[in-house]
Amino acid sequence: MVLIDGVEASVAQIQQIAATDIDNVSVLKDAASAAIYGVRAANGVILITTKKGVADGKTRIEYDGKVAFDNISSTWDLLTGDEYRSLKESMMNSSIQLAQDKGNAMVDYGGNTDWMKEITRTAVSHQHYISLNTSSKYSRTAASLTYNNYQGIVLTSGKEEINGRISTEFKHFNDNLKVNLNLAYTSKNQIPVEKSALRQVLIWNPTMTPYQEDGSYTPGADPLIYRNPINLLNETRRDDKYNIFTGNAKITITPLKGMTLTGMLGLDRTM
């Protein structure tokens, strides 16, 4: 069981929290401490407390940014166009009989293309985080916005993510009344790697060029078997988009010393 600021959290809510927004994490493992949460806490309770601003009456703005570069560390050892031509010539000059050449796969088109290199890139990813913390005599507020853009090594793949969060705490009547409000919004767009394009890299003729003289994609000799890997990546791009909105409110009243009344309300919606 996971509680964020005293309210039970879903997996989506946990994923929405940026590490820089977390103030404290504690674990309740003994039965006595977890008993107040019922049977759902049988395996323990994880308590996550988010930042709500420092109660010093000041306003603070923080920014953190990162840039990362990724390259493919190893790749398949495929024939180059020249190696392909040499192999074909050796086979033609030997007693080896070629099987049926489906789609003219063994034809020499005069190019010398490294298809794995053509569909990969140096991926540039960047992350940005900005936060605002403010407080007054009766309240504390912390707001943050995170933007992550992860570019995939394979063309067209990657992930873009935006996280917004605001946490506010109000105290009145000598702290006998406390109200906590937490709102979070996440927008994600993930573009997975098109695996069929990787298969085409393995079987595509290395003597063919990616583009024709007019700039259009070079078609496969047999379109039912061979498809241009670059064209395939652009044509079959799939964007997996979704938005998550979560929020919770908690009110704590202390009418008498040693007596506390607590009410909680939560919302979790994925669109």
Regions found by a protein language model. Give the residues of each.
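Soluble periplasmic/extracytoplasmic beta-strand elements of cell-envelope proteins
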Residues: 1-5, 24-28, 45-49, 62-64, ...
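Outer-membrane beta-barrel transmembrane strands
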Residues: 121-139, 146-148, 230-271
